[in-house]
Design a protein with these regions (language model features):
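A membrane-periplasm/extracellular boundary helix in multi-pass inner-membrane enzymes
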Residues: 221-270, 284-291, 414-415
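N-terminal signal-anchor transmembrane segment
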Residues: 1-53, 69-79, 364-366, 381
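Loop-to-helix entry and N-terminal half of a specific, functionally important transmembrane alpha helix
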Residues: 15-22, 124, 192, 341-370, ...
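Membrane-interface helix-loop-helix junctions at transmembrane boundaries of multi-pass membrane enzymes
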Residues: 4-13, 48-63, 175-189, 225-237, ...
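Transmembrane alpha-helices of multi-pass inner-membrane enzymes
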Residues: 40-47, 214-215, 355-365, 373-416
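Aromatic-anchored transmembrane helix interface
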Residues: 60-72, 82-105, 115-124, 167
């Protein structure tokens, strides 16, 4: 046993490092299959072979996501051409398995949460810097990190790049407001890079997601901590951060190229949103059409019938996964938000990570009304974090109940 124990500890460290590296790779998706898919496919497969445990708490996530993808498989029967459909559902199933994987390894050890968020933050800073440098054409060939004069970092789409940066930005905001002041300059610098990357993505969804989730985070922190000194610190640092970001925005807007694109993108409703067969018209027609198609129409078919894809996660669930998939996805999302909300204010070592993940899930569900988040890798990571933390809470309560019984059994004396 003495020999086996160090070996087990070494294997756990290697496993945790492999997970952190996988999360880091999620920030670099220029082409598909991306390095993230290749790495995580091997990692998830190996971990399952070695005996990954799925507890009763995380089993509903597995059941709902598998049912969601069964709906996708049924929708394939409605397609005339199966050229791209099966691969799309295969990717969906793989992403579902990554979510289960993250939930299970977090339940196994909450110490993996800092590794996950630090790796995510590191990847976010690097990909954000690539987007910023590309936007300003800092070196030859840097335009590969932009699309339509919008920063996209090491992603294919600015609308995915921007939201990817938001959860690590929230993590940094929490670290600035509640962490050690010695690390404040480093965290503030990293946050500024992420904020600039989000801004230069010119994604209205990312802008709204960042602004609203930061406000929700600050509100919940003020609600949880009742210390007057802590609340004063949060308010002062929040005010300082707002002033710094506002000043950075003013400086960025002095660049004519930035100012022009900002003026165009800052409009709440663009021409392609409100015109005939625009975004909102397609939503209306699509929902009406899906009321008559219980099995959906198949992956990527909607874009061949209309000028663009669904750009709505609820409509996407109906078209690509049918009624079964839609009910499963909505049920999974509601369950995720309920679990997180119920445990979010408890004083636990994993509470900050749960809070950031829950707020991010809520924000992504909201922007899902105007954008498709179906194949966003980081969204499945967020699902896994919330469910993993919920499983940690169940295990914590079970342990707390058993300890008094053990003490009572050892120390109690009965008289006849």
């Amino acid at each position: 046993v003495r020999v086996a124990q160090p070996q087990r500890l070494t294997l756990r460290l290697i496993g945790s490092a492999a997970v952190a590296f996988g999360v880091f790779l999620s920030g670099f998706v220029i082409d598909e299959p991306a390095p993230y898919e290749l790495w995580m496919a091997g990692l998830v497969g190996l971990w399952f072979i070695l005996g990954l445990k799925i507890s009763r708490t995380t089993a509903p996530l597995l059941a709902l996501l598998l049912t969601f993808n069964i709906g996708g498989m049924l929708s394939l029967t409605q397609m005339r051409d199966l050229a791209t459909g099966p691969m799309y559902i295969a990717v969906s199933t793989f992403l579902a398995l990554t979510s289960i994987f993250y939930a299970a390894i977090i339940e196994d050890s909450h110490k993996r949460l800092p590794l996950i968020f630090n790796a995510w933050s590191f990847a976010a800073v690097i990909t954000s810097m690539l987007g910023i440098l590309g936007y300003f054409h800092a070196f030859p060939g840097s335009e590969v990190f932009t699309l339509y004069d919008r920063a996209k970092g090491a992603f294919q789409d600015p609308n995915v790049f921007g939201p990817f940066l938001v959860p690590p930005a929230l993590y940094l905001v929490h670290g600035i407001l509640a962490g050690n002041l010695r690390t404040l300059p480093i965290k503030a610098g990293a946050l500024l890079i992420l904020a600039l990357g989000i801004f230069l993505s010119f994604s209205r969804a990312a802008w709204g997601l960042f602004a609203v989730t930061v406000l929700i985070l600050i509100f919940i922190m003020l609600l949880k901590e009742r210390s007057g000194a802590f609340r004063l610190r949060v308010l002062i640092l929040s005010l300082g951060a707002i002033i710094l970001m506002a000043a950075s925005l003013v400086v960025a807007l002095q660049v004519p190229k930035v100012s022009e694109l900002f003026s165009a993108r800052a409009q709440l409703v663009q021409q392609y949103d409100g015109e005939h067969l625009g975004r909102f018209d397609r939503h209306r027609i699509g929902f009406q059409m899906m009321m008559e198609r219980p099995l959906g129409i198949g992956p990527l078919v909607f874009g061949t019938m209309f000028p663009e894809d669904e750009h709505n996660i609820w409509l996407k669930s109906l078209t690509t996964y049918g009624w079964l998939g839609f009910v499963s996805y909505v049920g999974m999302l509601c369950w995720t938000l309920t679990l997180g909300f119920r445990n979010m204010l408890l004083d636990r070592p994993w509470q900050p990570f749960l809070m950031v993940a829950w707020i991010s899930v809520l924000g992504h569900a909201t922007i899902g009304n105007v954008i498709d988040i179906d194949h966003w890798r980081h969204v499945y990571l967020l699902f896994g974090i919330v469910w993993g933390c919920a499983a940690l809470e169940v295990r914590h309560r079970r342990s707390a109940r058993s300890q008094p019984l053990e003490k009572f059994g050892k120390g109690a004396k009965f008289r006849a």
